Amino acid sequence: MSPTPALFSLPEARTRFTKSTREALNNKNIKPLLTAFSQLPGSENEKKCTLDQAFRGVLEEEIINHSACENVLAIISLAIGGVTESVCTASTPFVLLGDVLDCLPLDQCDTIFTFVEKNVATWKSNTFYSAGKNYLLRMCNDLLRRLSKSQNTVFCGRIQLFLARLFPLSEKSGLNLQSQFNLENVTVFNTNEQESTLGQKHTEDREEGMDVEEGEMGDDEAPTTCSIPIDYNLYRKFWSLQDYFRNPVQCYEKISWKTFLKYSEEVLAVFKSYKLDDTQASRKKMEELKTGGEHVYFAKFLTSEKLMDLQLSDSNFRRHILLQYLILFQYLKGQVKFKSSNYVLTDEQSLWIEDTTKSVYQLLSENPPDGERFSKMVEHILNTEENWNSWKNEGCPSFVKERASDTKPTRVVRKRAAPEDFLGKGPNKKILIGNEELTRLWNLCPDNMEACKSETREYMPTLEEFFEEAIEQADPENMVESEYKAVNNSNYGWRALRLLARRSPHFFQPTNQQFKSLPEYLENMVIKLAKELPPPSEEIKTGEDEDEEDNDALLKENESPDVRRDKPITGEQIESFANKLGEQWKILAPYLEIKDSDIRQIECDSEDMKMRAKQLLVAWQDQEGVHATTDNLISALNKSGLSDLAESLTNDTETNS
């Protein structure tokens, strides 16, 4: 009999793996682990899970014994090697990192995180990325919660940069898709006027002056203030603006907007009245900039009343405030997908924002040093930001295009377009000619024979119109000499014969008279027609009278309902018809040739059905231009099955005419 295979024993396997892990750490070689893994009985999953437990057990002992960070990192490096050799699960190194960062103090976490930063290429590899990205994100967020934003600024920045390097640009977890604001960023300042020392400070400065004490800046280093008169009201209004920069949606509220408008005008007036010169900048700061010295600053404002005068005299501080204005204005004017439909600026607000934006750019250009260059750079960056805003509104599609599965590119054979490929492909089964105007003309009447039979294509004049002049000349009372009569004109005679053949029965009736020439024959026909047709006017019309009659006829045509309906649709008509269209706007949209992307944009912009209907009609008007007429709109309504609305629009048009 064959011997029975050995069964897997968890305690024995764990002891063996723990011993092998210690040996591998001492030798700095993974071979002991590989040997133990191959010799132990059991399935691969059982051995992997046991080795994962062994790693965590060894790491726990090192943390309890307060071992150096190098020993801890050696265990994690060994686990990375184990994943590469397929002897432990891919999530093991990340679990170990999480355990270490949870147990060690912040100063040692800095060393551990340096190791994490150096191995970013490892984390992004196919072996580790899918299994570890959520662990790393959770680990970094937990670490950020432990860190102080004011004392550990650099460490927090390193974590954010690491996440930016680890995840692709289109990663949803870091995009703030719903455009939320950091409402926790509250700027605290003195709101009790009784505790303010601004008035006392300025009084003492005027009477006694300010002495330079030991430890303060000397004459060479102290920036000269711009002598801005600061009181508590200016201090309070200035720092109150930070709440609007923190939460811009307050500007859509009527009362809050008035407060923001008032405070902003006062603060910007102070910036305009008290401008800074290059000489007011700190000499020490200027020397550091010239020599390439490191310029370190902290983004959180200091709101002490004692610093207000120095802050307003600081060019960098002014730039911060003016930049906040520009960012706020860009949000208020921009199209944000998740912005509520109620958040709409009035014309007055839009005009004020436009004027104030110009003033802010002007203040930036006048602010030293290199104000003009800085202003242009900021304007360029904010213009570029519009592209990112559009990308975000579209759902942040990935910039990376996936390769086709076939390695060999197949040759694309261009098929010659058949008539069926471009005839009747539009939403209204339109024939696409390739030009907007030609397409419109071609589709006025799809049936060519019916178009030829249309009354509008009847160019042949009536007998009365054509022979009116000849009948007047044939009247003896008018005394027109024979040589000046129209019947003597050969061109007129040729056209007269063709018209008589089409419209007069006398042309085919036999006659006993013998005519020597065409003028004589036409003279005889004119006399016959004069007896049958209504009598002409008593006076021979002059050229001016004919022009006046033509103008009157043209005016009458313009006053006719058909011509009125051929005029472009007005804003009042759009407003009135949108209320009737309502929820049926989406049925009409394809028949107005509105693109699917525009329809989706209309749905995102507003939840009100009447507003969506109005936006649809406005988009159609912008698309068609002068061809956006009520007649074309009625035609589209009939084709879409909305005949009731088409009849209502027809009645409204005739009533208004």
From Swiss-Prot:
Domain of life: Eukaryota
Residues joined by cross-link Glycyl lysine isopeptide (Lys-Gly) (interchain with G-Cter in SUMO2): 31, 408, 580, 595
Any one GO biological process: RNA splicing
Keyword annotations of the record: Acetylation, Apoptosis, Cytoplasm, DNA-binding, Isopeptide bond, mRNA processing, mRNA splicing, mRNA transport, Nucleus, Phosphoprotein, RNA-binding, Transcription, Transcription regulation, Transport, Ubl conjugation
Acidic residues bias (residue ranges): 206-221
Positions of post-translational N-acetylmethionine modification: 1
Motif (Nuclear localization signal): 414-430
Region (Disordered): 194-221, 533-569
Main subcellular localisation: nucleus
Region (Dock domain): 133-167, 227-397
PTM remark: Expression is altered specifically during apoptosis and is accompanied by the appearance of novel forms with smaller apparent molecular mass. Polyubiquitinated, leading to proteasomal degradation; probably involves NEDD4.
One GO CC term on file: nuclear speck
One of the record's GO molecular function terms: DNA binding
Phenotype of gene-disrupted mutants: Mice show early embryonic lethality and severely diminished fertility.
Domain Death residues, every copy: 570-653
Assembly information from the UniProt record: Component of the THO subcomplex, which is composed of THOC1, THOC2, THOC3, THOC5, THOC6 and THOC7. The THO subcomplex interacts with DDX39B to form the THO-DDX39B complex which multimerizes into a 28-subunit tetrameric assembly. Component of the transcription/export (TREX) complex at least composed of ALYREF/THOC4, DDX39B, SARNP/CIP29, CHTOP and the THO subcomplex; in the complex interacts with THOC2, THOC5 and THOC7. TREX seems to have a dynamic structure involving ATP-dependent remodeling. Binds to the hypophosphorylated form of RB1. Interacts with RNA polymerase II. Interacts with LUZP4.
Domain notes: An intact death domain is needed for apoptosis.
Role of this protein: Component of the THO subcomplex of the TREX complex which is thought to couple mRNA transcription, processing and nuclear export, and which specifically associates with spliced mRNA and not with unspliced pre-mRNA. Required for efficient export of polyadenylated RNA. The THOC1-THOC2-THOC3 core complex alone is sufficient to bind export factor NXF1-NXT1 and promote ATPase activity of DDX39B. Participates in an apoptotic pathway which is characterized by activation of caspase-6, increases in the expression of BAK1 and BCL2L1 and activation of NF-kappa-B. This pathway does not require p53/TP53, nor does the presence of p53/TP53 affect the efficiency of cell killing. Activates a G2/M cell cycle checkpoint prior to the onset of apoptosis. Apoptosis is inhibited by association with RB1. Essential for early embryonic development. Required for normal gene expression during postnatal testis development.
Full protein name: THO complex subunit 1
Organism for this UniProt entry: Mus musculus (Mouse)
Native organism taxonomy: Eukaryota, Metazoa, Chordata, Craniata, Vertebrata
Gene giving rise to this polypeptide: Thoc1
